[in-house]
């Protein structure tokens, strides 16, 4: 009789922590039982612990808590902590580093996303040029902390060392790789029905011109698999290709729905074939019933309803952002195109304004990915994730700038948005706690929140937060003071008084302003 294998103390500790509900320990114990190296192989026990993991992470809230940069690009040291609310907005002057912060976050999110798609993927992109030129250590470190359901933290540290340094620092990847394996293994356990988080970055380059020919060629080259969950993670950090992916995916769904509809009815050719078989009306009726039953059996009503629901979700999300668009459809004649019904008229989506196209491309891509990543949710737009958007105000009319954040939060209520902007109108739609200002003093950087709250205020209050005058700086402070003095005198009905005339006479060259 074999003696039972002695269980090491660290394994006992993991089992105890797993029974107390710790996510990481539950997955580790599941792996122990599955691998059979530390514990005796027991698939049933492995699945038992994995069920606990799946229960926690399926459609779980995921958030970026903070990211720390060391000698990354212009920042020798910087820590970004996200707002407790769903949206955080980074502001600063041109060249202050807004995009750099978003890029650093995207590197960590992309590493997690790539590992969910491909197990044990150690690849991440860093260039030597991303190391701060004044770095004494000769290395850059980007350290990120994510939270699941506010209870479980996972950290990742990405490092790039210069070739010529002797003391190199290693990346710390294991926790993110473990989190990715949790999603993979749980999805296998749940027969591909588990919800994956949406992780995506939309850089400024997303505003490239959308062309119908490019989208059609892309579709012909790559026909999307509408049910492939990995499609929801692919190219999520390359904003330039997203609309073509959406076009291809939407066209594939539309084709399948049309095929289902075609099988709901009997064609003229089928009727002529039945008539050629017999003149007996009762027999013809029986044959028609048999044919319809056969077609109905061919159609998978569950699949059809699922696809129609997906299509409707996309259309509703676009309509939320561009209210005068009633419908999005695929047109096949005289050529393949995507069209919209706008104010009662059908128009190619590629002929809309740049602002409309930029917004539709962004919204449709987020919605498409959520639909793919959340196959079991009644409303997939309620899926969780983290989305980064650089210059959210890009090409948007001021009216849209005032509503974009609210619409993003209402349409995608469980997404954490981290945005950058130059628009004071955007800032008037969030609280001071949601705003992070890049502050530099003697080459040291900090992210600060404004002391005044711009929410619901005038744009002038937001301009003050951005340290920008509400009046164009075309005059000296002295001239601006005189202009205000003149305006005050006129408003009091003293346009003919000596002081008013003196200002007018002395500063005649500024007559256009006073």
UniProtKB/Swiss-Prot annotation:
Keywords: Antiviral defense, ATP-binding, Nucleotide-binding. InterPro entries: AAA+_ATPase, ATPase_AAA_core, P-loop_NTPase. It comes from the Bacteria. A motif (ATP-binding) lies at residues 92-99. One of its GO terms (molecular function) is ATP binding. Pfam families: AAA_21. GO terms for biological process: defense response to virus; DNA synthesis involved in DNA repair; double-strand break repair. SMART domains: AAA (SM00382). Gene3D superfamilies: P-loop containing nucleotide triphosphate hydrolases. Probable ATPase component of antiviral defense system retron Vc95, composed of a non-coding RNA (ncRNA), a reverse transcriptase (RT), this protein and a putative HNH endonuclease. Expression of retron Vc95 confers protection against bacteriophages T2, T4 and T6. At multiplicity of infection (MOI) of 0.02 cultures slow growth when infected with T4 but do not collapse, at MOI 2 cultures enter growth stasis. This is Retron Vc95 probable ATPase. It comes from Vibrio cholerae serotype O1 biovar El Tor. The lineage of its organism: Bacteria, Pseudomonadati, Pseudomonadota, Gammaproteobacteria, Vibrionales.
């Amino acid at each position: 009789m074999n003696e039972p294998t002695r269980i090491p103390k660290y394994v006992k500790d993991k089992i105890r922590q797993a029974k107390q509900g710790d996510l990481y320990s539950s997955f580790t114990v599941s792996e122990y039982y599955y691998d059979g190296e530390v514990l005796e192989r027991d698939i049933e026990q492995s699945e038992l612990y994995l069920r606990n993991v799946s229960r926690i992470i399926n459609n779980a809230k995921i958030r970026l808590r903070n990211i720390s940069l060391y000698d990354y690009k212009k920042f020798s040291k910087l820590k970004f902590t996200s707002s407790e609310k769903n949206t955080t907005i980074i502001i600063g002057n041109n060249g202050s580093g807004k995009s750099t912060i978003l890029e650093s976050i995207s590197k960590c999110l992309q590493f997690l996303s790539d590992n969910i798609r491909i197990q044990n993927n150690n690849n991440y992109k860093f260039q030597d040029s991303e190391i701060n030129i004044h770095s004494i250590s000769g290395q850059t470190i980007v350290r990120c902390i994510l939270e699941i359901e506010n209870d479980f933290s996972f950290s990742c540290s990405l490092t790039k060392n210069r070739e010529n340094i002797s003391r190199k620092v290693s990346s710390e990847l294991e926790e993110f790789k473990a989190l990715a394996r949790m999603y993979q293994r749980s999805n296998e356990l749940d027969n591909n029905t588990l919800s994956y988080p949406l992780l995506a970055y939309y850089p400024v380059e997303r505003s490239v011109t959308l062309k119908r020919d490019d989208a059609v060629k892309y579709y012909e080259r790559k026909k999307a698999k509408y049910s492939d969950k990995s499609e929801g993670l692919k190219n999520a950090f390359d904003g330039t290709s997203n609309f073509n992916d959406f076009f291809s995916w939407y066209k594939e769904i539309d084709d399948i729905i049309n095929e289902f509809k075609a099988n709901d009815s009997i064609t003229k050719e089928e009727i002529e074939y039945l008539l050629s078989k017999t003149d007996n009306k009762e027999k013809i009726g029986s044959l028609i019933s048999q044919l319809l039953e056969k077609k109905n059996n061919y159609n998978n009503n569950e699949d059809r309803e699922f696809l129609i629901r997906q299509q409707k979700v996309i259309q509703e999300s676009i309509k939320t952002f561009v209210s005068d668009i009633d419908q999005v459809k695929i047109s096949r004649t005289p050529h393949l195109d995507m069209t919209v019904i706008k104010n009662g008229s059908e128009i190619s989506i590629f002929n809309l304004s740049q602002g409309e196209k930029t917004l539709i491309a962004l919204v449709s891509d987020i919605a498409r990915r959520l639909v793919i990543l959340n196959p079991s949710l009644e409303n997939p737009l309620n899926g969780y994730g983290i989305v980064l958007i650089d210059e959210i105000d890009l090409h948007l009319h001021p009216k849209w700038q005032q509503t974009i954040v609210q619409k993003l939060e209402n349409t995608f209520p469980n997404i954490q948005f981290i945005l950058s902007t130059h628009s004071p109108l955007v800032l008037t739609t969030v609280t001071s706690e949601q705003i992070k200002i890049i502050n530099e003093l003697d080459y040291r950087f900090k992210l600060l929140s404004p002391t005044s709250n711009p929410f619901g205020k005038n744009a002038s209050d937001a301009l003050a937060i951005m340290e920008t005058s509400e009046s164009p700086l075309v005059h000296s402070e002295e001239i601006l003071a005189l202009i205000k003095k003149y305006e005050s005198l006129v408003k009091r009905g003293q346009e003919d008084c000596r002081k008013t005339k003196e200002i007018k006479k002395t500063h005649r060259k500024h007559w256009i302003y006073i």
